[in-house]
């Protein structure tokens, strides 16, 4: 009997990607986040689709259409909170996934790593535009502040901002185009995720030890499938707990006030997952300098493979680098906290020191530490 799984042109691709895929036998739970991101993406597309059926992208009715979804649509409140908190879970998984890549040296697969960075930027853009759609106070002012950063670009800045806005301020045209982009981008993300997987399966997965695992591979199904399902159960449990018990925990109360262009909220801030970058932006007194620091805080990931000076791929057996990695994690948590605080003493100086430390760890301390560890390993 012919095995369709291995011969059918379409099923064969799925088989080689998710069933018979040779996988290192020693990959840990840190490798679960790729599949969790896939689950998050599917969940966001499905909940978003149902929200889009009832949402209207018009400044006059956007806020009330979201209220209508929560009050009048069957389980609309549940769909809305699953979508809003699903974004938070998405970013938690993203940060864990990138952190794992940094820790275990997965960035030495340059194609996979660079597609991953493009994915990260695309997801960030999608989330930002989604935050604007409910048309609350923080939606409006967040959109105004962040899009206004484009005006820091010399010569063409002002024209560029007005082009993005579709007028002389954030208004109906801006909301309509943001909704259009927010709808289409998840499908682009899906396509990019497939390319990400394509490049990953060219090389095979990395593993915690960082050494080639060709002699010791096992099929993806059933071993890692069952492991992924456990991860999905934990993800859904966390998401359900968040959406059902404290749906507004990670949101901003200001967004329950309809957008008012005539009065700005006392503290304009983005969603929690952008606060680290927002803190870096605010820590530099110069507008253009702040924007460049903001962009570089993410794009710094592109040069990480060039800064790898260690003879070992993974940090598993490099205690000094491990200390620096966890210092970087603590620094990012500090930046996240600072991003949500008002611009006053002592938060300004803490933010500046944390921003300097962030770039110093990645650009200076990690490469130097790796060189020191290389010399220590000769003893």
Swiss-Prot record:
Lipid metabolism recorded as keyword: no
CDD domains linked: cytochrome_b_C, Cytochrome_b_N
UniProt subcellular location: Mitochondrion inner membrane
InterPro entries, per the entry: Cyt_b/b6_C, Cyt_b/b6_C_sf, Cyt_b/b6_N, Cytb/b6-like_sf, Cytochrome_b, Cytochrome_b_C_euk/bac, Cytochrome_b_N_euk/bac, Di-haem_cyt_TM
The record's free-text note on cofactor binding: Binds 2 heme b groups non-covalently.
Keyword line: Electron transport, Heme, Iron, Membrane, Metal-binding, Mitochondrion, Mitochondrion inner membrane, Respiratory chain, Transmembrane, Transmembrane helix, Transport, Ubiquinone
Pfam entry (one): Cytochrom_B_C
Requisite cofactors: heme b
Source domain of life: Eukaryota
Family the entry assigns: Belongs to the cytochrome b family.
Subunit structure and binding partners: The cytochrome bc1 complex contains 11 subunits: 3 respiratory subunits (MT-CYB, CYC1 and UQCRFS1), 2 core proteins (UQCRC1 and UQCRC2) and 6 low-molecular weight proteins (UQCRH/QCR6, UQCRB/QCR7, UQCRQ/QCR8, UQCR10/QCR9, UQCR11/QCR10 and a cleavage product of UQCRFS1). This cytochrome bc1 complex then forms a dimer.
Described purpose of this protein according to its UniProt entry: Component of the ubiquinol-cytochrome c reductase complex (complex III or cytochrome b-c1 complex) that is part of the mitochondrial respiratory chain. The b-c1 complex mediates electron transfer from ubiquinol to cytochrome c. Contributes to the generation of a proton gradient across the mitochondrial membrane that is then used for ATP synthesis.
Protein name, entry field: Cytochrome b
């Amino acid at each position: 009997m012919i095995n369709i799984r291995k011969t059918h042109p379409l099923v064969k691709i799925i088989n080689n990607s998710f069933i018979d895929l040779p996988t290192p036998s020693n990959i840990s739970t840190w490798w679960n986040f790729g599949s969790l991101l896939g689950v998050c993406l599917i969940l966001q597309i499905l909940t978003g689709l149902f929200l889009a059926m009832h949402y209207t992208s018009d400044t006059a009715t956007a806020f009330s259409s979201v209220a209508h979804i929560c009050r009048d649509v069957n389980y609309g409140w549940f769909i809305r909170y699953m979508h809003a908190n699903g974004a938070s879970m998405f970013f938690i998984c993203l940060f864990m996934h990138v952190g794992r890549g940094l820790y275990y040296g997965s960035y030495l697969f340059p194609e996979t790593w660079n597609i991953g960075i493009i994915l990260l930027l695309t997801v960030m853009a999608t989330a930002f535009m989604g935050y604007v759609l409910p048309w609350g106070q923080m939606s409006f002012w967040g959109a105004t502040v962040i899009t206004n950063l484009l005006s820091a670009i010399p010569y063409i800045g002002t024209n560029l901002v007005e082009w993005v806005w579709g007028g002389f301020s954030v208004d109906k045209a801006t909301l309509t185009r943001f909704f259009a982009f927010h709808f289409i981008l998840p499908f682009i993300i899906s396509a990019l995720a497939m390319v990400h997987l394509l490049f990953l399966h060219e090389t095979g997965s990395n593993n915690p030890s960082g050494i080639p695992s060709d002699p010791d591979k096992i099929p993806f199904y059933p071993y890692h499938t069952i492991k992924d399902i456990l991860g999905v159960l934990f993800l859904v449990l966390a998401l359900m707990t968040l959406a059902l018990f404290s749906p507004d925990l990670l949101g901003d109360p200001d967004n329950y006030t309809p957008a008012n262009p005539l009065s700005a909220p006392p503290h304009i801030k983005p969603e929690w997952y952008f606060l680290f970058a927002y803190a870096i932006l605010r820590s530099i007194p110069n507008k253009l300098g702040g924007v460049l620091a903001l962009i570089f805080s993410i794009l710094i990931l592109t040069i990480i493979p060039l800064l790898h000076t260690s003879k070992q791929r993974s940090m598993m057996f490099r205690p000094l680098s491990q200390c620096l990695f966890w210092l970087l994690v603590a620094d990012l948590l500090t930046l996240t906290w600072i991003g949500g605080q008002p611009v006053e003493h002592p938060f300004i100086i803490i933010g500046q020191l944390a921003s300097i430390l962030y770039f110093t760890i990645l650009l200076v301390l990690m490469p130097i530490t790796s060189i020191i560890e290389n010399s220590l390993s000769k003893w």
